[in-house]
């Protein structure tokens, strides 16, 4: 096998052969159409080293001149009104920005959101049950996370269809000149700004109101409020969509595992963790840049070199996981060695919320739709053509 192609329908459907080729070699210089390149880290041990390395920073300003000129960062990386959030920050700024949101993801709020997730899921499954068929992506995996993250943030109902439509565009791989992503970013920035302004006038009990209150005390700047709200709105639902869709597919195609998960909540939890490992809704961790010479996997990475950690490749590394390419929830029950949510200080703040929604969705599907089956052959399913997130366009079922 020659050097693999890391984009296209075949790769989207099954990236394992490409990643196996890459893991046999030191970190790879991955070229982009812009003419620039980045180090791609694919081995589990190297990924853990990179994600924990104190000399690898997140601030886009740390990228070298070639990367800065290339425009490889999302458009929002270069807008103060959208880039001033925790993903682009390093301690102590990262610590301050993360702390500003932490209360919204605490145990008490998670219990409230579990009850809301159950209500939303029941309503969505009611509709599928009444029709006798459905699409578990459009009928469940999308509307549930959007409803929950908008509830948490305090985004009114009238904006939610726009959130769905335009966030899809941001992850599109067919936007060769970036114009669609810029348009989507503009629309969603205006949406978030409108909601923030409304909360400044009348605060509620939601996260955006909390952020606005911290702005009033000087803890956060106006740009940090908007950036944080934007980050959580987009990042807080897209990966959960992928988790629910790919987990539902795994249950539909592994009836023995579905039967165990139906009876045992612990096995259902193992299904969620194995889905996160095998399908890693966030395929690649966000950019990192060395502040000094750093050696990882036998390669020396220079200050400013852009680095991507392939979470999906690392999670399928046979050096770290037995039967790494297979769905084996029982074999790995109780383990959380995968890096689907990252590790270290940048561990995803919404990890518990994503797991909660997946648990509610899977428990409800297994209980209420026990005879659900795929309505098309599995090989006909199409995967998102995204270098960022992993998920399905559709998951049609019959009852």
What function would you assign to each model-found segment?
Residues 1-399:
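Cytochrome P450
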């Amino acid at each position: 096998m020659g050097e693999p192609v890391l984009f296209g329908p075949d790769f989207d459907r099954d990236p394992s052969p490409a990643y196996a080729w890459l893991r046999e070699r030191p970190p790879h210089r991955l070229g982009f159409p812009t003419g620039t390149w980045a180090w791609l880290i694919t081995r589990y041990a190297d990924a853990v080293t990179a994600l924990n390395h104190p000399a690898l920073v997140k601030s886009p300003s740390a990228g070298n001149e070639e990367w800065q000129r290339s425009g490889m960062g999302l458009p929002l990386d270069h807008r103060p009104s959208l880039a001033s959030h925790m993903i682009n920050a390093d301690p102590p700024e990262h610590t301050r920005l993360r702390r500003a949101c932490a209360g919204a993801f605490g145990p008490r709020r998670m219990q409230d959101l579990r009850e809301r997730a159950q209500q939303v899921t029941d309503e969505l499954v009611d509709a599928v049950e009444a029709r006798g068929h459905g699409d578990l992506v459009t009928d469940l995996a999308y509307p549930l996370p959007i409803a929950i993250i908008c509830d948490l943030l305090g985004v009114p109902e009238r904006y939610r269809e726009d959130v769905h439509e335009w966030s899809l565009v941001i992850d599109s791989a067919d936007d060769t000149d970036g114009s669609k992503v810029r348009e989507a970013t503009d629309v969603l920035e205006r949406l978030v700004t409108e909601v923030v302004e409304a909360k400044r006038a009348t605060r509620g009990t939601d996260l955006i109101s909390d952020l606005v209150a911290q702005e009033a005390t000087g803890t956060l700047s106006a740009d940090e409020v908007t950036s944080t709200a934007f980050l959580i709105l987009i990042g807080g639902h897209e990966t959960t969509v992928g988790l629910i869709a790919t987990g539902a597919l795994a249950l539909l195609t592994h009836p023995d595992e579905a039967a165990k998960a139906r009876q045992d909540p612990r096995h259902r939890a193992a299904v969620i963790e194995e889905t996160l490992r095998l399908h890693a809704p966030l395929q690649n961790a966000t950019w990192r840049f060395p502040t000094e010479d750093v050696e990882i996997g036998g390669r020396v990475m220079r200050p400013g070199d852009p680095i991507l950690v392939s979470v999906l490749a690392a999670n399928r590394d046979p050096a770290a996981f037995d039967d790494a390419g297979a769905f084996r929830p029982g074999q790995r029950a109780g383990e959380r060695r995968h890096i689907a949510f990252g590790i270290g200080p940048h561990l995803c703040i919404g990890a518990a919320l994503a797991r909660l929604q997946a648990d509610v969705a899977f428990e409800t599907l297994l209980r209420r739709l026990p005879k659900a089956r795929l309505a098309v052959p599995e090989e006909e399913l199409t995967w998102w053509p995204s270098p960022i997130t992993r998920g399905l366009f559709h998951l049609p079922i019959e009852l």
